[in-house]
């Protein structure tokens, strides 16, 4: 199996390099690649890459994910999240390749308290959500052999993440205020990559699984409770924190250019049934990431 990966250096892309390697021959690209074009600001170049390589599977982990920045550069977000996805979809259809693509809960209006189903009506709150929805539609229209995984609250051990930011602040400050009215499931890039590799194997033998899926870790939390778990684990590991008070505040306490959904819960039953997988509780992955952080780096 020949696999083409776009966005190899992002949170999910980095883990995909590991998870996809046993499936076959992997060509991994990013914006700086020189052998082939992996620059999503150049849709024609990216489409040409697909036609040259003629892969069996394309995994797209590249995107414009700066949610607030997208509000001030909607055309650039549209180019990366929709126009380029359409170019890939058309080229993939031409060469007979599968396309695996990641989307977001931001395609929904973010109200209510019920986990969103794949069949629920979309109504994005911001530019990022609008462009990601446009990318989904382009892929669905132009390439039948696709898997779209909507995910949420993605983190990775590599690079910056919410937990590391909270730990840094908790060492500097005695009091912190964290949002407690946004609900979701922190989902590890490791989990996304491993589930993707498994799904590709299933799709190769059962093409009828093509379609749209929700893919997040199990359970639900808030940013406030997520932070509380991080601090609890840090103290258990013997890390000294200056923090002695963690306040819960509403989203309105931190105004941002892009509106944020209150309800980022996603129903994953369809994914678990079709791919015969179990999605572990969010705490499993977060605790593992923290354990690695505490034992391998001077934080």
Swiss-Prot record:
Q: What class of enzyme is it?
A: oxidoreductase
Q: What positions does the entry give for dTDP-beta-L-rhamnose binding?
A: 104-105, 153
Q: Which residues bind NADPH?
A: 11-12, 39-40, 63-65, 102, 128, 132
- Reactions catalysed, as given in the entry: dTDP-beta-L-rhamnose + NADP(+) = dTDP-4-dehydro-beta-L-rhamnose + NADPH + H(+)
Pathway it belongs to?
A: Carbohydrate biosynthesis; dTDP-L-rhamnose biosynthesis; Bacterial outer membrane biogenesis; LPS O-antigen biosynthesis
Sorted keywords for this record are: Carbohydrate metabolism, Lipopolysaccharide biosynthesis, Magnesium, Metal-binding, NAD, NADP, Oxidoreductase
Q: Where is this site: Could provide a fine-tuning to achieve optimal pKa matching between active site and substrate?
A: 104
List the EC numbers from the record.
1.1.1.133
Official protein name in the record: dTDP-4-dehydrorhamnose reductase
Q: Which organism is it from?
A: Shigella flexneri
> What gene does the UniProt entry assign to this protein?
rfbD
């Amino acid at each position: 199996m020949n696999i083409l990966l776009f966005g190899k250096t992002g949170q999910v892309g980095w883990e995909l390099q590991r998870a996809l390697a046993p499936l076959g021959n992997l060509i991994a690209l990013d914006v700086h690649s020189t052998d082939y074009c992996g620059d999503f600001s150049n849709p024609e170049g990216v489409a040409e890459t697909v036609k040259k390589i003629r892969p069996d599977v394309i995994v797209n982990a590249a995107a414009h994910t700066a949610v607030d920045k997208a509000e001030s550069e909607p055309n650039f977000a549209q180019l990366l999240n929709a126009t380029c996805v359409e170019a890939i979809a058309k080229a993939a259809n031409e060469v007979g390749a599968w396309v695996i693509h990641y989307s977001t809960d931001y395609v929904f209006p973010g109200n209510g308290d019920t986990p969103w189903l794949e069949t629920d009506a979309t109504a994005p709150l911001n530019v990022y959500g609008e462009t990601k929805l446009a990318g989904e539609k382009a892929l669905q229209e132009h390439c039948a052999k696709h898997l779209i995984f909507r995910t949420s609250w993605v983190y990775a051990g590599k690079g910056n993440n919410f937990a590391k930011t909270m730990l840094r602040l908790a060492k500097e400050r005695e009091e912190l205020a964290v949002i407690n009215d946004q609900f979701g499931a922190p989902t590890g890039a490791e989990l996304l990559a491993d589930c993707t590799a498994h799904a590709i194997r299933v799709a190769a033998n059962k093409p009828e699984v093509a379609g749209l899926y929700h893919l997040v870790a199990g359970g639900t939390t808030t940013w406030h409770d997520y932070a509380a778990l991080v601090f609890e684990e840090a103290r258990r590991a013997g890390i000294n924190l200056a923090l002695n008070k963690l306040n819960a505040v509403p989203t309105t306490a931190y105004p941002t250019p892009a509106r944020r959904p209150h309800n980022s819960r996603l129903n994953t039953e369809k994914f678990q049934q079709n791919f015969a997988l179990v999605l572990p509780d969010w705490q499993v992955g977060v605790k593992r990431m923290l354990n690695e952080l505490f034992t391998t780096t001077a934080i």
